[in-house]
């Protein structure tokens, strides 16, 4: 009997322009098929309406892309696979990413002959590096500004409910999935003092959580619902985060109401019988006085939800009406009415996961940009069933901005031991006492060579 694996705690949603969703999803599936076919980490959705990045997001001095995806592939498994991965990355819709500062100066600290790629200038930057030993690693890296690094560690430890494995003082990672020959990691990298982060606006990190009412008062920025099961917020550096609520088994639902909504609307910000109770009192995620003004500066750009015909007007749920969520102005481009935060609560909305031969199969999935449920009765390779018919004709994106990249590898990189246990309360953590972990087969090794950690 095949072992049933739990769904990943993290999903990376990529928001594509209209008509490009199918093409980008196929490009990702094709690339990852030869590395980790059993893992479905990246999901592409199409935006409800296009965004003009040139007007909204202006280039700033010394800003680094906030997210990268790095592939560490074993040379011992054959160079043919390495060449195949590079061949995929050099084809459309992939584009070469310029490794230079916004002022046009090249980055002298980049490794020789290192190439970077991206599907869009507001999506993660991709890179590939061959390694001599250990396992294949797919590493999603978030780059943190110097002052926010330790707070970011506490935040993601709380969301993932596990401790970070510290490799050195400015780099740590979480192992999300591991087999004998493959490891999936989320890592945090501290940027040098004075360098700011350029968040990728078309990239959204979605975490599976069991309780939302306990998390909301601990988050550094406002957290608002975009559907009955998902909430949107940001981390300290502006990276978009979605929290998808999966209540614990046995939690009842009465009259179509979700228990986590009741706690939030009643103002139960200090729940009893919770491992996060002491944390909410001390607010350890906001240790400095500068956090006071962060909420005032932060503007919540909720994902807009197109109104389906006749589906929301019939909603009589008093919880949602009590919050006063109403319609937005009509979209000038499509003439279709947009509605924000007004989805009726249904007990079975969200992702229903089926298992087939140890492989995750999606029965129903909520579109990250619209909040609607998308039915998918096919496994990974049948992506078109997840999109409407007009998504089938897709064109590749063409715009890439000149953001700067830095790639270094830790000089003391060895074989590391990962630690996966339940969350230690942030108030009980002493980051000055974190120790370097060694001797594990899941992480990158260096054989007598001085390498720097992949780093923007």
From Swiss-Prot:
<protein>
    <recommendedName>
        <fullName>Protein FAM124B</fullName>
    </recommendedName>
</protein>
<comment type="similarity">
    <text>Belongs to the FAM124 family.</text>
</comment>
<dbReference type="GO" id="GO:0005654">
    <property type="term" value="C:nucleoplasm"/>
</dbReference>
<feature type="region of interest" description="Disordered">
    <location>
        <begin position="262"/>
        <end position="313"/>
    </location>
</feature>
<keyword id="KW-0539">Nucleus</keyword>
<comment type="subunit">
    <text>Interacts with CHD7 and CHD8.</text>
</comment>
<dbReference type="InterPro" id="IPR029380">
    <property type="entry name" value="FAM124"/>
</dbReference>
<dbReference type="GO" id="GO:0005739">
    <property type="term" value="C:mitochondrion"/>
</dbReference>
<feature type="compositionally biased region" description="Basic residues">
    <location>
        <begin position="289"/>
        <end position="300"/>
    </location>
</feature>
<dbReference type="InterPro" id="IPR046365">
    <property type="entry name" value="FAM124_dom"/>
</dbReference>
<feature type="compositionally biased region" description="Polar residues">
    <location>
        <begin position="272"/>
        <end position="284"/>
    </location>
</feature>
<dbReference type="Pfam" id="PF15067">
    <property type="entry name" value="FAM124"/>
</dbReference>
């Amino acid at each position: 009997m095949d072992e049933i694996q739990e769904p990943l705690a993290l999903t990376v949603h990529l928001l594509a322009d209209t008509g490009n969703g199918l093409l980008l999803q196929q490009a990702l599936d094709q690339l990852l098929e030869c590395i980790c076919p059993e893992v479905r980490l990246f999901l592409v959705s199409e935006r409800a309406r296009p965004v003009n990045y040139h007007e909204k997001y202006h280039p700033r001095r010394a800003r680094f892309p906030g997210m990268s995806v790095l592939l560490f592939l074993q040379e011992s498994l054959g160079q043919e696979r390495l060449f195949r991965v590079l061949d995929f990355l050099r084809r459309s819709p992939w584009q070469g990413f310029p490794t230079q500062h916004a002022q046009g100066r090249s980055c002298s600290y980049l490794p020789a002959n290192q190439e970077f790629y991206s599907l869009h200038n507001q999506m993660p930057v991709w890179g590939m590096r061959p390694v001599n030993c250990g396992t294949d690693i797919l590493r999603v890296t978030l780059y943190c500004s110097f002052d926010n690094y330790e707070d970011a560690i506490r935040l993601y430890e709380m969301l993932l409910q596990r401790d970070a494995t510290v490799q050195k003082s400015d780099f740590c990672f979480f192992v999300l999935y591991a087999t004998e020959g493959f490891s999936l990691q989320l890592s945090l990298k501290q940027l040098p003092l004075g360098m700011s982060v350029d968040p990728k606006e078309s990239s959204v990190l979605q975490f599976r959580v069991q309780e939302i009412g306990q998390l909301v008062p601990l988050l550094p920025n406002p957290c608002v619902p975009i559907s009955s099961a998902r909430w949107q917020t940001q981390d300290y550096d502006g990276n978009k985060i979605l929290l998808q609520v999966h209540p614990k088994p046995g939690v009842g639902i009465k009259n179509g109401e979700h228990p986590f909504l009741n706690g939030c609307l009643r103002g139960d910000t200090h729940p009893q019988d919770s491992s996060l109770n002491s944390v909410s009192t001390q607010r350890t995620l906001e240790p400095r006085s500068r956090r006071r003004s962060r909420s005032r500066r932060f503007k919540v750009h909720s994902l807009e939800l197109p109104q389906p015909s006749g589906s929301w007007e019939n909603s009589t749920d008093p919880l949602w009406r009590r919050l006063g969520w109403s319609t937005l102005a009509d979209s000038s481009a499509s003439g279709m009415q947009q509605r924000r935060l007004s989805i009726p609560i249904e007990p079975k909305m969200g992702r229903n996961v089926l298992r087939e031969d140890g492989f995750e199969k999606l029965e129903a999935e909520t579109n990250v940009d619209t909040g609607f449920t998308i039915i998918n009765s096919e496994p990974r390779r049948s992506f078109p069933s997840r999109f409407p018919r007009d998504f089938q004709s897709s064109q590749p994106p063409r715009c890439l901005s000149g953001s700067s990249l830095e790639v270094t590898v830790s000089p003391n990189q060895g074989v590391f031991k990962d630690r996966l246990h339940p969350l230690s309360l942030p108030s009980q953590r002493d980051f000055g006492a974190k120790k370097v972990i060694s001797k594990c087969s899941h992480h990158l090794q260096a054989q007598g060579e001085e390498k720097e950690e992949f780093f923007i």
